[in-house]
Amino acid sequence: LSSRFVVVNRQVLWRSPILLTPYRSDYTIDADELKEFFGNAFKEAELTPEDIDTGAVILTGEALKRNNARAIADLFAEESGKFVCASAGHNLEALMAANGSGAVALSRQEHQTILNIDIGGGTIKLGLCHGGKLLSTSAFAVGGRLIAFDEDGKMIRIEGPAEQVAEDVGVKLTLGEVLSKEDRKKIVSRMVDVIVSYATREPNDELCKALLLTENLPQTPAIDGITFSGGVSEYIYRREEEDRGDLGRSIAHDLRHALADKRIPEKVYDPGHGIRATVVGASQFTVQVSGNTIFLSEKEKLPIRNVPVASLSIDLSVDFTSEEVTASIQDAMKRLDMVEGEDRVAIAFRWGGDPLHARLFALAQGICNGLPKTVADPDLPMVVMMDGDAGRTLGNILVKELDVTGEVISVDNVQLRDFDFVDIGEYMPDTQVVPLIIKSLLFTSPGQE
């Protein structure tokens, strides 16, 4: 039996129009325009904020770099009281796009290796999927809005990576001037060359290397199919034709020609979610209750809200070492773009095998070594969650044998995964449990609504 609720039906009630992120000249996001957009959306959907049970605010790409980005996101999250707020770095955004686009589900359905190419305004995120799992991610600085134009065709925004590409093809970019058709074609063609190089896993020239934001994708396994997501994908799949005053439509046009010429030879699938890929997994509440063998070193500090979950991939049902636990934590943090010691995190794992002291001690030691800054920071709670019945024993080992002096929360009989955020409620002494609210980002499969 499981205490986790299962989603049996999902229905899209209303879709908003797409709003390009409103940037101001002082390197901030226009909060007033966002508020007006959200207000109009509620009116058109015939809903009020009180009607919404849960949601998510996700910061990605160029918007994440703006001076007031986090403050705006936190404001909307806190005003609703029910929203989670996540900052998506390159790896996490690639992971979310691969899931949200339907590429991960497609790889499971087709029993194939699928490469999702998420083309946004400032970056491209790659997600390599196989058998329903994301194997690897990568990102590089090419995007549809690295150059933006006004109604007269004059350049009103030029990002650094665009200047790198322009310099590579001998074009000078100047704000307020018109970019000639010939120079525009040179820049777009070179950007598509870079996309093709990364899609075929051959990014060997100097410009490709200069634009790389993460590690490269591995050379194996062989790719069977390609999917596209992000704003530019709407042009690739011909769902959008209107020019948005940037390079997006031109990039898609040249990329379609590259696909037709088999420069990217794999079959192209359309899983359907395109520009909404990173937000299609709208957050949902589930409720769980912990086991009664939990460990809380400082009960009075509860409740805590919106702790992101990092799920470990290590198999703890067989023999393992503390070093393997540490490596699994580091991999999870990297996968989700979390910075250990700066971000609160709940380490979640499946527990199997005998609850012998030696095994639990190795687990605890691996956790401490994987979270050294958390251990050293008395203001940062160590949150550990498992599906087995060893929460109290693990907590005792962490505090009494490994001398963790900060707050330790060790909760058992709970099932968590990546894209979950957890609220841990106040301790209930009569039943010796804590209530948990799990907010999950849920992703549809291709063909679902």
Label each residue range with its predicted role:
Residues 332-333:
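A short, well-ordered alpha-helical element
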Residues 261-262, 374:
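Secondary-structure transition/capping motifs at alpha-helix termini
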Residues 118-120:
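Conserved catalytic-loop position in the HRD/HxD motif
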Residues 1, 124-129:
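Short beta-strand scaffold segments in enzyme catalytic cores
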Residues 247-260:
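Hydrophobic alpha/beta core scaffold segments
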